[in-house]
């Protein structure tokens, strides 16, 4: 029994150390930019040696990937919270759309000098976010399936609609971040318009 406890404690220590590196790296990337941050900078700011850092990450690119992954996990957790809310499927879809867009914007803005890297190195971001994309499609699939079962949505292919929804939102990320969607219009005012558009596409039963 004592042996199991030690293994769990060691595992927690490893996880905590790795997460500390990720947190510190994100802050350094946000402040100085990816190019101006070295592995040595990350190790020193973490209060650890370079050897310890290289135990967890082979390169700065790997650390950067971990930072993106962590940010996507934050977004995924928030979407999961919304998915668990007790509300009608059509309302939940709108809430998921705005939660996704607002969280993406908050993440990019919060990361300062790292934001340019998000757009410059889009292929690395795409590689890291693959699992997140798949999970979000599955989340939409479940909400659409519930709406179809209750008669609120007239959907022939739930899987296809879930996939289309995900990629439509993904395509709106950059213009939303830069405020190019509905200039001068508040989110409160856009929600009814977005809802009307989405409900029409889903064949919402009245």
What role is predicted for each listed range?
Residues 101-141:
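Short secondary-structure transition hinges
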Residues 1-5, 138-150, 163, 167-206:
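C-terminal peripheral helix-coil segments that are non-catalytic and often amphipathic
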Residues 2, 20, 24, 28-62, ...:
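Helix-turn-helix
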Residues 10, 154, 158-162:
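Membrane-interface starts of transmembrane alpha-helices
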Residues 66, 80-106, 161-165, 188-191:
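Hydrophobic alpha-helical connector segments
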Residues 69-75:
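Short, basic, alpha-helical segments at the C-terminal edge of helix-turn-helix-like DNA-binding modules
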Residues 82, 111-118, 176-180:
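Secondary-structure edge/capping motif, primarily at the C-terminal ends of alpha-helices
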């Amino acid at each position: 029994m004592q042996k199991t406890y030690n293994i769990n404690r060691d595992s927690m220590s490893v996880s905590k150390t790795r997460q500390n590196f990720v947190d510190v790296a994100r802050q350094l990337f946000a402040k100085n930019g990816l190019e101006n941050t070295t592995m040595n900078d990350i190790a020193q700011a973490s209060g650890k040696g370079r050897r310890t850092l290289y135990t967890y990450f082979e390169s700065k690119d790997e650390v950067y990937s971990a930072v993106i992954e962590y940010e996507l996990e934050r977004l995924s957790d928030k979407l999961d919270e919304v998915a668990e809310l007790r509300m009608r499927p059509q309302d939940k879809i709108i809430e998921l759309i705005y939660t996704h867009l607002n969280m993406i914007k908050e993440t990019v803005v919060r990361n300062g000098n790292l934001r340019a890297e998000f757009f410059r190195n889009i292929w690395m971001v795409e590689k890291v976010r693959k699992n997140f994309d798949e999970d979000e499609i599955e989340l939409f699939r479940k909400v659409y399936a519930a709406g179809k079962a209750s008669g609120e949505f007239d959907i022939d292919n739930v899987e296809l609609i879930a996939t289309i929804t995900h990629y439509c939102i993904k395509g709106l990320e950059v213009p939303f971040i830069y405020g190019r969607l509905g200039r001068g219009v508040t989110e409160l005012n856009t929600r009814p318009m977005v809802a009307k558009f989405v409900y029409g596409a889903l064949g919402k039963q009245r």
